[in-house]
Structure formats: structure tokens, C-alpha cells
Amino acid sequence: MSKSTIEPKNKKSVNRGKEIAKDTILTPNFYTTDFEAMEKMDLSINEDELEAICEEFRKDYNRHHFVRNKEFEGAADKLDPETRELFVDFLEGSCTSEFSGFLLYKELSKRIKDKNPLLAECFAHMARDEARHAGFLNKSMNDFGLQLDLGFLTANKDYTYFPPRSIFYATYISEKIGYWRYIAIFRHLEKNPEGKIFPLFNFFENWCQDENRHGDFFDALMKAQPRSVKSLSNKITIGGSTFTHPLFDYFHRFRYFLNNHPFVSKLWSRFFLLAVFATMYIRDQGTKKDFYSALGLDAREYDQFVINKTNETSARVFPVVLNVFDDSFYRRLDSIVENGKRLSEIDKKDNQNLNKVLSKIPIFISNGYQLLRLYLLKPLDSKDYQPSIR
């Protein structure tokens, strides 16, 4: 991707970058991880599958797919102000999310290329895809006289640290949920072309295949992880400061032993599935319903379809998945959405900050309770869940 596709071209683009640099729990985050642990990963258990996936990446099926055509000319001017605002918000979030993936994958490919070349090459190919997506979205923003300052975001947005295994869980789910989100929108608009508010959606069918291949890579990578890990690192980072001692190696061994224990793997599977599903559902139902309505979609039905399909797909790699069919699953998520509306109403009031905080405490407790109950729902064993997909 050429550098010009991600650089700001006007004053407005800089402002957009600064706005999105402000983190909230529902905005796309930027991530970093333990690069030393990543470069020491032994892939031999599943190297053949990883090599096959890397060969698929090398073919770059979408190399010539993301080419704008005449349909884009004047398309932005046809949108009414309300739909325009909704679509620009969608473009901002999507572009930031894709760029976040690019930064993580690119940094991984650079840091581990000397000691783990196969893994580094896979990450480099995925960084290529994510950069292409972000650049294409940013060009659509330019149709509206805006462009994200991705360079500003790179330098100023906070980075959240996750250990490698957590990155694998979260990114696998995110890539697979991205596939189902894009293909669901594409298929809907294929049957209901009157909802196609912008030509960008014509590209979603091939686009989602990139997401699917990325998810397959993380599937293969998780299968490649051994039950025991040799010397990992004698370093530990606390509050941004790095400390070195030989004993820290045993800490890392114990941590990796726990992460690879079957019982702990089940807990992590449930945690990350719930985290990704709840974030998407709460965001969409709380602030994105009008956008989906503009496409002719019912936001609740759309989210339920995407969550159910992603949950089903995740049964191929995780030992357990969430029981999304339990009557209380979406009911509890809806309760959190309603609590979000109550929080917004409190923020609109002219009360003093202390009164606002006190008013919010019961709502936060309610949200925590609902999430805990969702986490404690008896999961579905992947061996018994939709065996036809395995």
C-alpha cells in the first residue's frame, strides 16, 4: 500500500484522528504483545497446515479486487445528512479497526522475522491485507471530505498489552466475526439492493474472505502450541518497567502451563467469546441501530445471526462455546444495552460530577452482574455442538 493512502490530506482528517485517539471501551483498540515469546514459538506440531495457509496468503487473491470504479463518483452526495453521518461513523470505526490489525501484524512480522520466519511471513501477508482494507475505507472517507490521520493515531492512541495466547483467542474471534458481519451485509444487500447506500458494500464478498483466511491462520496457530514451553524469558514487565531475574523464567513456565491446561482453556474460550460478542452487541444496539436500519437490516436480528454463526464456527477450535440459545443470553445483553441508555441520560443532566458518579454506581453493578451471569451460563461442549461443522 502506498504511503499516500494513509496520510492526512486536509485539516479535517487531522481532527478525525484526534477524536478517535480518545479511547472508550467500545472503540477499536490498538494492541501490543510479548514479541520475545512469539519468536520462540515452536510451530512443528502443525507446521504443514501453517505452511499451506501461508501459501494461500502468497497467492493474494484480492490483489486486484480493491479498485474503485465509476459507481463511487458522486455517491457521497446522494446521501441525506442523517444517513451520511451514520455511514461516516461506520467508516471511521471500520478503518480504525483494520488499521489496528495492520499495526499489530506489521510489528510482529518485523520483530520475529529472524527467529521465526514462517510465522513472520504469515503476519506480513495479513498486515498487507489489513493495510489494503484501511486504505480503501479511508478513500471512501475522502469522498465525504474527510480522511483519518492514521499516522497521528499510530503515535497517540494508547496500546493495550495482551500476552500472545490472549491475542490468539481475541483475534481469531474478531476475524471470524468480521467474516460473518461482512457476508451477512453483502447477502442482504444482494437481495435488497435498495438498501445499498454506497458502492463500498459491493466489495464485501471478497473482503470477508480475507477475514476468513486470517481466522483460519489463528486456528492453525493455536493448534500448533505445545502443552509445555521451554525457557521463555527471564524478564517481566510491570507498569511499563522491565525487570530481569532468572526466577521470572519459572513464572512464565507456570503461566503458560495454566494457559494450556484444558480446564483453563475452557475458561478463556468463554471469556473471550463473551467479551467480543457483548462488545459488538452493546455497541450496535446502543449506537448503531439507525445505521443498520438505513441498510434495511434489523440490528437485533443481524447481531444475533452474526453471534450465533461465529459461536458455531468457534466450535471448530475452542473446547467449549457459549450457550447462545439459552433464553437469558440475549435478554441479559439487552439489559446492559438499556443500562447504557440510562448512563447516557445521566451524562446529559446538569448534576454535579459527584452526583453523576453516585447515580451510575448501581448501573455499573447491574452490568457487572449481568455479565457474570452470562459468563457462568453452562457452556456448550464443542464435541456435541453442531457436529456437522467439525
Curated annotation (Swiss-Prot):
Associated pathway: Porphyrin-containing compound metabolism; chlorophyll biosynthesis (light-independent)
Organism superkingdom: Bacteria
Enzyme superclass (EC): oxidoreductase
Keywords: Chlorophyll biosynthesis, Iron, Metal-binding, NADP, Oxidoreductase, Photosynthesis
Reaction(s) catalysed by this chain's protein: Mg-protoporphyrin IX 13-monomethyl ester + 3 NADPH + 3 O2 + 2 H(+) = 3,8-divinyl protochlorophyllide a + 3 NADP(+) + 5 H2O
InterPro entries: AcsF, Ferritin-like_SF, Rr_diiron-bd_dom
The keyword Oxidoreductase belongs to this UniProt entry's keyword annotation: yes
Pfam families (UniProt xref): Rubrerythrin (PF02915)
EC number of the protein: 1.14.13.81
Coiled coil: none
GO molecular function, one term: magnesium-protoporphyrin IX monomethyl ester (oxidative) cyclase activity
GO biological process, one term: light-independent chlorophyll biosynthetic process
Disulfide bridges in this chain: none
Cofactor(s) this protein cannot do without: Fe cation
Family statement drawn from the similarity comment of this UniProt entry: Belongs to the AcsF family.
HAMAP family: AcsF
Function: Catalyzes the formation of the isocyclic ring in chlorophyll biosynthesis. Mediates the cyclase reaction, which results in the formation of divinylprotochlorophyllide (Pchlide) characteristic of all chlorophylls from magnesium-protoporphyrin IX 13-monomethyl ester (MgPMME).
Name of the protein: Magnesium-protoporphyrin IX monomethyl ester [oxidative] cyclase
Species the sequence originates in: Prochlorococcus marinus (strain MIT 9215)
Taxonomic path: Bacteria, Bacillati, Cyanobacteriota, Cyanophyceae, Synechococcales
